[in-house]
């Protein structure tokens, strides 16, 4: 109950931040589309079209509550900066040394102990089922999963090689422009809960 109440307070705050802001400007700065006739934003997130109704900022279809909050924070902070094409770990974001560094270590440990021990094809299929796009790269598996139009996320995995006694290894990256759209706290939430958490459930690990 307390957790639900805390979430509701945070959502109320997120909506207050957006109150009075021009929906056209919000759309232009975030890469979303705004239909003035319907008073609806349309934004592509994790491969799906999400509608956000203006001015109450309700969602359809209903999506995970933390996904909703992250998108509202994205709309509020987005300043139109275009992705640079340069990838950084979460620890390299502003104020990311502790929260971002903690996530980097958690993900590396997950890959070393569980994710990287699975067959590469099994993980690839699970990633594609979640809407991730397999892209070229210097890893055994490299996938891209865009949280929002201007907020791409990539994941690189090297799978364990028992013959050479090499453990699995992996990193998750965001574009260097990430600080223009989300705080480190929001970025950790979306990477840990909305991406890694879903992938773990998809794989049953």
Language-model segment annotations:
Residues 46-108:
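Aromatic- and glycine-enriched beta-alpha-beta binding-site module
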Residues 63-67, 115-122, 183-191:
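Short amphipathic alpha-helical segments
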Residues 118-182:
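Conserved binding-pocket/active-site segment within a compact domain
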Residues 175-205:
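A recognition module on extended beta-rich or small alphabeta surfaces enriched in W/G with H and D/E
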Residues 1, 12, 16, 36, ...:
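N-terminal leader/targeting peptides and immediately adjacent processing regions
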Residues 1-31, 92-142:
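Negatively charged, low-complexity tracts enriched in Asp/Glu with abundant Ser/Thr
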Residues 48-73, 158-185:
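Intrinsically disordered, low-complexity regulatory segments enriched in Ser/Thr/Pro
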Residues 25-54, 133-160:
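Amphipathic, interaction-prone secondary-structure segments
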């Amino acid at each position: 109950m307390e957790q639900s109440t805390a979430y509701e307070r945070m959502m109320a705050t997120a909506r207050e931040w957006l109150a009075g802001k021009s929906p056209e400007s919000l759309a232009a700065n975030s890469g979303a589309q705004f239909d003035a006739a319907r008073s609806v934003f349309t934004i592509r997130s994790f491969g799906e079209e999400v509608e956000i109704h203006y001015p109450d900022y309700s969602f359809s279809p209903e999506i995970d509550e933390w996904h909703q909050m992250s998108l509202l924070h994205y709309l509020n902070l987005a300043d139109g900066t275009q992705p640079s094409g340069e990838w950084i770990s979460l620890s390299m974001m502003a104020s990311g040394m502790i929260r971002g560094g903690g996530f980097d270590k958690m993900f590396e440990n997950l890959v070393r102990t569980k994710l990287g021990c699975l067959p590469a094809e099994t993980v690839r299929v699970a990633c594609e089922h979640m809407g991730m796009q397999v892209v070229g790269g210097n890893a055994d598996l490299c996938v891209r999963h865009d949280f929002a139009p201007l907020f791409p996320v990539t994941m690189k995995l090297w799978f364990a090689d028992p013959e050479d006694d090499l453990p699995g290894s992996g990193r998750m990256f965001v574009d260097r422009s990430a600080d223009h759209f989300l705080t480190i706290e929001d970025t950790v939430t979306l990477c840990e809960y909305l991406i890694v958490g879903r992938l773990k459930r998809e794989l049953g690990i």
